[in-house]
C-alpha cells in the first residue's frame, strides 16, 4: 500500500511538473508574439513614407526632442548546393525629425580564402527615397542593378501578420541572461507570406520554410537589441536559402 501511495504521489508530481513546464512555455510564446506584434501589426506598410508619422518603442536612450529613425531592412540569401552564397538586400534609415531617407542596396557574395575561411565580397549602392520612390544617388552602369533598386520592395510593404495568433506549438527559446528569445514555426507553401516571397524571388526549392521570430533585449520593449524575422527554406552545410526582415526605431544620430 505504501509503495502504491508513493507511486501515486510520484505520478502526480510528474504531471504537475510537466503541466508547469508546458504552461511556462506557452506563456513565454505568448510574450514573444506580443513583443513582435507591436511592429508586425503595422504590416503591410504600402507607402513607406507613412513611417514618418508612425510611433515606435521609446525609452531613456532617446532625447526628448528626438522622434527617432526607423531602420528597415530586407535581404534574400541563396546558396545552391556546392556553390557560393549570394545575397541581395536593402536597408533604409528613415529620419522622422527631418522626414528624409537614405540607405543602400547591397549585393554580397561569400568567397573563401586559401585556408578555406569565408570572406564576404560586398558591393554597396547608395540610395535615397523621394515621394516613396527609391532612387540611386550615384550613377550605376549596370542596368540590371538599376532596375532591381527601382523595383525593390521591402517585406514590410507586402507581408502580413494579421493572423500571427494562428501560429501555434512553436519551438520556443528564451535566455534571460542575455536576454534573447525566439519562436520557430513550420509553415506551409499555402501560407500568404510564403506565396508572396515565391512571387518575388527565385527560390530554388519547393520545401516549405520555417518562420523564425528572434530578438534580444527586454521582451517588453527596448531600443537596445534587435527583432528579426526569418523565413528559412534550407539550412545545411554548403546549402542555404533564407529571407530576413527587420523594422525597428532607434535614436537619431542628428540628436
From Swiss-Prot:
Q: Where in the cell is it found?
A: Cell membrane
Tell me which GO cellular component terms the UniProt record holds.
plasma membrane
N-palmitoyl cysteine lipid modification positions: 24
Annotated signal sequence is 1-23
Major site of localization recorded for this protein: membrane
> What membrane topology was assigned to this protein in its record?
Lipid-anchor
Transmembrane ranges, per UniProt, are none
Q: Which Pfam families does this chain map to?
A: DUF576
Task: Identify where the record puts lipid attachment of type S-diacylglycerol cysteine.
Answer: 24
Keyword terms, alphabetized? Cell membrane, Lipoprotein, Membrane, Palmitate, Signal
Per the record, the similarity remark reads: Belongs to the staphylococcal tandem lipoprotein family.
Full protein name? Uncharacterized lipoprotein SA0096
Q: Which organism is it from?
A: Staphylococcus aureus (strain N315)
Q: What is the lineage of its organism?
A: Bacteria, Bacillati, Bacillota, Bacilli, Bacillales
